[in-house]
């Protein structure tokens, strides 16, 4: 991709110098538990990429807190603790979830006196039952398949300092919202919001998810690479689903393998690639930081917004 003029671009080697002497707080085993099962992130990636990123987030967080204090003083209002929200966007299968979980772990390590929490916007998809009623099952993941009113209200409650907020839970295992199961957000200092739509501007909304984010990251890669990771992930899902009849992927796991792979290729072509090209990729240049991946999920370049 051609570098936008409003970003500073860094090679991996340049970026790693920004925190070259920092101590790595993870082991290989703890990293294995964090990463998605087809993501090849290494301890070296954590050292080279994520440690400097956490230090940058720390600067952004400190600046944000100071601005909140100064604004309260100017308005002669009591100072309130308003959560700092980090948005992480990008295509399916590009590694957003791993990036979000890793950032959560590292922030918990370095921000020892702050509450760090993570939420995914998948929980705000309409249930499969509701999607069928709206004739939207073939559009699952597209902007109209999300309950944006509920997501915006959730983020507003977070910023407003509501003490306990419930968020619906989505399960990739059952491919649906889990009834009567919730994640609880308890007045965090930092909330990480991960999802394909964190930078989108739906045409029927007056306020957007990005209006609530204070620092945003877009995880980027060539679509042909993302497709290979998508298909690789599908193969791994089949390998883990064949012993569990409750798993959404079970029928594909025990059925004809070639037919299952052909279906996954159609899903990528007709749904996920289309969604990427029409709705996700156009949001890339709205991010504060772009993390670019190449073969093997290796991060080779980072772009940081200048202004």
Curated annotation (Swiss-Prot):
Record flagged with keyword Transferase: yes
UniProt KW keywords: ATP-binding, Coenzyme A biosynthesis, Cytoplasm, Kinase, Nucleotide-binding, Transferase
Gene3D superfamilies for this protein: P-loop containing nucleotide triphosphate hydrolases (3.40.50.300)
Lyase is among the record's keywords: no
Reaction(s) catalysed by this chain's protein: (R)-pantothenate + ATP = (R)-4'-phosphopantothenate + ADP + H(+)
Biochemical pathway: Cofactor biosynthesis; coenzyme A biosynthesis; CoA from (R)-pantothenate: step 1/5
Enzyme Commission code(s) on record: 2.7.1.33
Cellular localization per UniProt: Cytoplasm
SUPFAM superfamilies: P-loop containing nucleoside triphosphate hydrolases (SSF52540)
Record: residues binding ATP: 90-97
Family the UniProt entry places it in: Belongs to the prokaryotic pantothenate kinase family.
Protein name from the UniProt record: Pantothenate kinase
Organism of origin: Levilactobacillus brevis (strain ATCC 367 / BCRC 12310 / CIP 105137 / JCM 1170 / LMG 11437 / NCIMB 947 / NCTC 947) (Lactobacillus brevis)
């Amino acid at each position: 991709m051609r570098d936008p003029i409003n970003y500073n671009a860094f090679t991996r080697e340049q970026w790693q110098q920004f925190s070259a002497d920092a101590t790595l707080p993870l082991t290989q085993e703890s990293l294995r538990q964090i990463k998605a099962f087809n993501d090849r992130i290494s301890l070296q990636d954590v050292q080279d990429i994520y440690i400097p990123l956490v230090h940058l987030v720390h600067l952004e967080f400190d600046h944000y807190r100071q601005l909140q204090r100064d604004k309260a003083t100017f308005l002669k209002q009591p100072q309130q603790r308003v959560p700092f929200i980090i948005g992480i966007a990008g295509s399916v299968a590009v590694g957003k979830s791993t990036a979000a979980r890793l950032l959560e772990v590292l922030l918990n390590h370095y921000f020892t006196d702050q509450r760090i929490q993570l939420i995914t916007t998948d929980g705000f998809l309409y249930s499969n039952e509701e999607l069928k009623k709206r004739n939207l099952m073939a559009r699952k993941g597209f902007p109209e398949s999300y309950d944006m009113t509920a997501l915006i209200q959730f983020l507003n409650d977070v910023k407003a300092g509501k003490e306990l907020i419930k968020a619906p839970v989505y399960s990739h295992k059952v491919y649906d919202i889990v009834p009567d199961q919730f994640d609880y957000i308890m007045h965090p200092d930092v909330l990480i919001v991960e999802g394909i739509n964190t930078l989108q501007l739906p045409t029927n909304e007056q306020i957007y998810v990005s209006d609530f984010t204070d620092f945003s990251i877009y995880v980027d890669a060539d679509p042909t690479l993302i497709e290979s990771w998508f298909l690789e992930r599908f193969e791994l899902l089949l390998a883990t689903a064949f012993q569990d009849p409750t798993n959404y992927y079970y029928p594909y796991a025990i059925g004809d393998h070639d037919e299952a792979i052909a279906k996954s290729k159609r899903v990528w072509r007709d749904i996920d690639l289309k969604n990427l090209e029409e709705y996700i990729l156009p949001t890339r240049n709205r991010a504060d930081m772009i993390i670019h991946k190449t073969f093997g999920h290796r991060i080779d370049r980072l772009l940081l917004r200048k202004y």
